[in-house]
Every structure is written in structure tokens, then in C-alpha cells.
């Protein structure tokens, strides 16, 4: 099980609204060098809900490249279970060390629906 500090990192963009991989490498690397035990990408702070699936994977791969072997977790924050399961499978295939799963903010499920959705995402990833 993981322990320690796992900051949810921001996603960096260029002035032309493209992912800024060089700046992310620098910032993610600084956090790892400062003693963080892992990082979380694609969360709300990291513009996750606004990124395309390809952009989310690109940010993850940038983080993984500078992680120094420390865990990199991908946030799953999709509107529906089908989309969330798809992102979880993609994260697993890309080498994610774990997932931070956020229940849908669009559909407010009851307890049983929420548990079923989270279980489906866990099984997919």
C-alpha cells in the first residue's frame, strides 16, 4: 500500500493552448525531487474533466517519464460508467500504478449505483 505525499498536479499549457510537456516535466520532476512519494494526474486541479482522453494519456505518460519509479496515479472523472471504465483500461495499458476515481458529477447515483459504478471501474483498471 502507498504512503506519503501524493500531490494532485496541475496540467501545463502553452500560450497556444497545447499541452506543455517540457513545463510539466520540469514541474513534476521538481515535486518528485522535493520528496513526494508519487503524483496524481488528471484531477480537477489538473484540468482532467476538460482534457480529451488522448490528452489525459499524454499527461500521464509525461508524469511517468519523470517519476523516477515512484507511483503515478491517473484520475478517472468521467460522466458515465462506460466512459470511466474505458479510461481505466487505457490507464492500465499505459502503466498507471493506480487510479483515483471520482464518482460522476453529472448523475447523482444512490449508494448501490455508486458502489456498482466504482466496482466496474476497479475491475476495468
Question: What does each model-found stretch correspond to?
Answer:
Residues 1-125:
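Active-site beta->alpha loop and helix N-cap motifs at the rims of alpha/beta catalytic domains
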Amino acid at each position: 500500500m502507498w504512503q506519503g505525499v501524493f500531490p494532485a498536479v496541475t496540467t501545463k499549457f502553452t500560450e497556444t493552448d497545447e499541452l506543455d510537456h517540457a513545463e510539466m516535466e520540469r514541474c513534476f520532476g521538481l515535486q518528485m525531487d522535493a520528496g513526494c512519494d508519487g503524483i496524481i494526474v488528471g484531477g480537477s486541479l489538473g484540468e482532467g474533466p476538460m482534457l480529451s482522453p488522448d490528452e489525459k494519456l499524454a499527461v500521464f505518460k509525461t508524469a511517468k517519464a519523470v517519476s523516477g519509479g515512484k507511483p503515478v496515479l491517473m484520475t478517472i472523472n468521467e460522466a458515465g460508467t462506460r466512459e470511466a471504465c474505458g479510461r481505466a483500461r487505457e490507464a492500465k495499458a499505459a502503466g498507471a500504478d493506480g487510479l483515483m476515481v471520482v464518482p460522476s458529477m453529472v448523475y447523482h447515483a444512490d449508494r448501490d449505483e455508486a458502489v456498482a459504478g466504482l466496482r466496474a471501474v476497479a475491475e476495468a483498471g
